[in-house]
């Protein structure tokens, strides 16, 4: 997946865009703004519009809209995963305070680079994120099957012991899927920490090189 998979992103309160980010030129912002005007303002939902080989993905929650424009080759699930990260970060930084009073585009400088970081993270970890999404879907499916089978068994008046055995079997499947999801999340955390440690090591090395060059070795004196 290339870095150009994500084209444009914004966060809006109602129809007012508070922060946006893009590295591309084009009419994506105006089309996204038009889509924003058409979104139901009261519902907490997810929407995707298709236009000119691109998807305009929206996550609406508590009066705020989170949008990302992506190439249509990128799965909707990955785009929504990006929006979930942006939403969580935005609410953590501004929820209940600055977000409710900010004016149009006033958070560009602060939150624009943050959206870029989330874009890069999703692109770099797309494979692991898709696996995690798949595991979550499997868990949801198992839960649905479990409830459906229990309802059918009750309707048929099955023996309670048989019903308990079936429930335990489905519960074991759900636990296995949950275990897989935990393993994927742990792998993502270790990879992210590894990157941070490498960057820290490089910075320390640069400081050491500068120190040696300025002091002509380790014998700095006042």
Curated annotation (Swiss-Prot):
Q: Which UniProt keywords apply?
A: Cell membrane, Coiled coil, Endosome, Membrane, Protein transport, Transmembrane, Transmembrane helix, Transport
Sequence ranges assigned to domain Longin in this UniProt record: 10-115
Q: Which GO terms describe its biological process?
A: protein transport; vesicle-mediated transport
Q: Decide whether keyword Transmembrane helix is in the record.
A: yes
According to UniProt, the tissues expressing it are described as: Expressed in flowers, leaves, stems and roots.
Q: Which InterPro entries match?
A: Longin-like_dom_sf (IPR011012), Longin_dom (IPR010908), Synaptobrevin-like (IPR001388), Synaptobrevin-like_transport (IPR051097), V_SNARE_CC (IPR042855)
**Where does it mainly reside?**
membrane
Tell me which domain of life the UniProt entry assigns to the organism this sequence originates from.
Answer: Eukaryota
Q: Entry's PROSITE patterns?
A: LONGIN (PS50859), SYNAPTOBREVIN (PS00417), V_SNARE (PS50892)
One GO cellular-component annotation of the UniProt record comes to:
plasma membrane
Query: Which family is annotated?
Result: Belongs to the synaptobrevin family.
| Function as written in the Swiss-Prot or TrEMBL entry | Involved in the targeting and/or fusion of transport vesicles to their target membrane.
PANTHER family hit by this protein: SNARE PROTEINS (PTHR21136), VESICLE-ASSOCIATED MEMBRANE PROTEIN 724 (PTHR21136:SF72)
Q: What is this protein called?
A: Vesicle-associated membrane protein 724
UniProt organism field: Arabidopsis thaliana (Mouse-ear cress)
